[in-house]
Amino acid sequence: MNFSNNGARKIFNGADMERIKCREHLIKSDVLFPPPPRPWVPTAPLEESRPSCIFSVMSYNVLSSSYATPKMYGYCPKEYLNWEVRGQNIMSEIFQYNADIICLQEVEMEQFDVFFLPNLQSMEYEGIFAPKSRALTMSELNRNLVDGCAIFWKIDKFSLDKSKLVEYKTLAVQDGADSSVMLNRVWSRDNVGRLAVLKTTAAAWTHGPPVDPNDIEQLIIVANTHLHWDPRFPDVKTIQSMMLTREIVAMVKSVRSSPERILKFSEIKVLLCGDFNSLMDSGVFQFLSTGQLPLSHSEFEGFDYINAIVNMMGGEYSDRITHPLNLSSACIPEIMPYTNYTYRFKAMIDYIFHSSSNMVCLGVYGPILQEWFDMFGVMGCPHPFVPSNHFPLIAAFQLTA
């Protein structure tokens, strides 16, 4: 039969072909085995000759239910996108690694209150949360679906000293009221950061307590953020990272002095976790890991941020913006080549940064072995055995006294 003149003739476009491939993948994926355990990769030797605090940190974008749709992830069976199933799988993943500090991104407001917080409290955690800025303007029903950032900590090892919400939208107005590019590009994004100042407890120390009682309660500033997603706006992500480091520096300065003890700036520990939506060759990574970024960086090309950045720096002009936090990334691509793994995109965009002068990274978990993806034709995540489109980053650290 000749279909050349048939009005019902179907012309398959790229999206149609992708759906066909996804359907074929699902048919072939009826029988699967879970991935093997992720390998532990030591990065520094353990110091055992003096009192130390050893703790683990997880950073994990859990994928908001609002984004986990069959249209977006057609290669994942629908039942495994359902929150009732996926949420339990995410919690199993969190419990499996049993981290002492947990930073989660894309946590919905209602899910924090009714799912994440009660489940983690049952495992002796406490936590705080901040939704994206748009939640303030929405009805209660819609507000519950807004995602944000959460920080949890084990109460036997840490106590909360203070916390702070960082709203990039608000800071864009403060820093760039006379900058059209700041208002048009940064102000319109509602990403947030969350800061928590944690104090180590006596139970957190091994090999005996510190000789100096003042060393028992060491301060760690934990920052968690989720930067703007769109690759067309690298300048926005870089500005957001600059705003966040400025707020962290301000927090360091505010906790340095106490009635009992004056601390040096370098004695305050910093952990910066999150989904930065930025590759390692980005301005975000360069700025955070090296402590500086020239204003001539290509990501600023064509945009006049000069006045806004001068305001961010306290009114002093320089040809570069800097921060004094001395941060290092716990993970590198040689260890963890990707933290986001979807059909169209696979790369490292999540990071755990830490103070490199006073905190030693002992090791990190590597990736799910590529052989597993290849063996079962796994096109991307989420997946029946991988509940998010991101993998959790997990690192261990040691403080000494």
Where are these regions (language model features)?
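N-terminal, active-site-proximal structural segment of metallo-dependent hydrolase catalytic domains
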Residues: 1-148, 241-242, 246, 250, ...
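Metal-dependent phosphoester-hydrolase catalytic domains
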Residues: 2-44, 188, 199-208, 232, ...
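Structured beta-strand-rich core segments of catalytic domains in phosphoester-bond hydrolases
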Residues: 25-54, 101-229, 233, 313, ...
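Active-site flanking residues adjacent to catalytic metal/cofactor-binding acidic residues
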Residues: 60, 104-105, 225, 273-275
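Catalytic metal-binding/acid-base residues of hydrolase active sites
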Residues: 63, 108, 228, 276-279
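Conserved phosphate-coordination/catalytic loops
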Residues: 80-85, 187-190, 235-239, 386
